[in-house]
């Protein structure tokens, strides 16, 4: 089966987060020689398929095995859940159609096209050396993500089945297939700052203390400020105010406080502690409360790593494009792999219609993506 046929089948399952809709049974049927592990909570389902090709004799011996003889373990990772399709599609979003060289359907780009490509590549992979190939799939990436990839990796750690390397099939490309590889992601820190004042009548300014005036005095040091200068892999960390709230809605009452909600997307140079230190210095003599919560940590996979190099070589060979190695964009499940010390990068389809009406992926793109993934498998197994 090729990537197109598999992707068409995957799209036909209406797997809106966290619904799995039986799609894992179909995927398991494609890999009868692979072992499976499944887990999940709160309606989320996760599937892990794995097979050891050409296991070394020492590995076969089980408890009598020598140490350090495990074959390289490579994992393809992705999600089968999709966001709700919304209205005004030209066709049923869960009945894939082919039109003018494109496959239309919810998840075509994000990320059933990528999953279909790596499933097809895995079916056609036949290494001659010891190699452990696995696939990790979740029904909760578009949602909270608490019981998805994160949970499955914790289970794999308990069973000593964590991979050495992984590719997450996120739709990373911007204009042409192969123009972008994510070799890391920025971290994300959410914050709430409350500046306190004294509520009162606007006609008696000496009896009140307006916290909005206080905010105005420090706003240039908070809003849009760069927290570091970045580096070759990361843009400068930046604090962005996303919401302001103050007052009772009356035009003659000054507020007792002003609440500022913000987010900082940050590089390895900035941490929650360094952000707190900076803000406390700015707010030193002002009555306030500050809350910070890190929702994800930044990570980077070396541009010269074996995984990055093999992927880059195969993109250049197959797509005739030199990919840009970058860390742009929001968070993804790749962060959960990195947290376990797993070498991880992200590569997948063009992302011009992700989460949009009439989501689509080109047929040529699926063909090339499958070839890239198969080339990566062959390159790693021959290394």
UniProtKB/Swiss-Prot annotation:
* Cofactor needs: Zn(2+); Co(2+)
SUPFAM superfamilies to which the protein is assigned, alphabetical: Bacterial exopeptidase dimerisation domain, Zn-dependent exopeptidases
Q: Which organism is it from?
A: Helicobacter pylori (strain P12)
What name is this protein filed under? Answer: Succinyl-diaminopimelate desuccinylase
- Taxonomy-wise, where does this protein's organism fall, top ranks first? Bacteria, Pseudomonadati, Campylobacterota, Epsilonproteobacteria, Campylobacterales
Q: Where is the signal peptide?
A: none
CDD domains for this protein: M20_DapE_proteobac
- Which residues does Zn(2+) 2 bind? 110, 142, 355
Q: What Gene Ontology terms for biological process does this UniProt record contain? A: diaminopimelate biosynthetic process; L-arginine biosynthetic process; lysine biosynthetic process via diaminopimelate
Pathway(s) annotated for this protein in UniProt: Amino-acid biosynthesis; L-lysine biosynthesis via DAP pathway; LL-2,6-diaminopimelate from (S)-tetrahydrodipicolinate (succinylase route): step 3/3
């Amino acid at each position: 089966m090729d990537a197109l046929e598999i992707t068409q089948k995957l799209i036909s399952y209406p797997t809106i987060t966290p619904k799995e809709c039986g799609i894992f049974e179909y995927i398991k049927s494609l890999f009868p020689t692979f072992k499976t592990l499944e887990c999940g909570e709160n309606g989320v389902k996760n599937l892990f398929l794995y097979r050891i090709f050409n296991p070394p004799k020492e590995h076969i011996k089980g408890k009598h095995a020598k140490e350090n003889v495990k074959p390289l373990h490579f994992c393809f990772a992705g999600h089968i859940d999709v966001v709700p399709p919304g209205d005004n599609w030209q066709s049923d979003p869960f009945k894939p159609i082919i039109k003018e060289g494109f496959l239309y359907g919810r998840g075509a780009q994000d990320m059933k096209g990528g999953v279909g490509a790596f499933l097809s590549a895995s079916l056609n992979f036949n290494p001659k050396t010891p190699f452990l190939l696995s696939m990790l799939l979740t029904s909760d990436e578009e949602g909270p993500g608490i019981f998805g990839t994160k949970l499955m990796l914790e289970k794999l750690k308990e069973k000593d089945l964590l991979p050495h390397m992984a590719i997450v099939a996120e739709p990373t490309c911007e204009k042409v297939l192969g123009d972008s590889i994510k070799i890391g992601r920025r971290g994300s820190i959410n914050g709430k700052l409350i500046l306190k004042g004294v509520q009162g009548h606007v006609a008696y300014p000496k009896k009140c203390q307006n916290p909005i005036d206080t905010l105005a005095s420090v706003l240039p040091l908070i809003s849009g400020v760069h927290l570091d200068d970045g580096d070759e892999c990361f843009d400068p960390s930046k604090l962005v105010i996303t919401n302001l709230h103050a007052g009772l809605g009356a035009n003659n009452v000054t507020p007792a406080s002003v609440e500022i909600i913000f987010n900082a997307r940050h590089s390895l140079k900035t941490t929650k502690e360094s952000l707190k230190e900076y803000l406390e210095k700015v707010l030193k003599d002002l009555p306030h409360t500050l809350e910070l919560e890190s929702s994800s940590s930044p990570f980077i996979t070396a541009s010269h790593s074996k995984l990055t190099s093999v992927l880059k070589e195969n993109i250049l060979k197959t797509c005739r494009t030199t990919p840009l190695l970058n860390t742009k964009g929001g968070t993804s499940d790749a962060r959960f792999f990195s947290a376990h010390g797993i070498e991880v990068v992200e590569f997948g389809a063009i992302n011009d219609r992700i989460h949009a009406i009439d989501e689509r992926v080109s047929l040529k793109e699926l063909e090339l993506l499958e070839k890239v993934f198969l080339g990566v498998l062959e390159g790693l197994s021959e290394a």
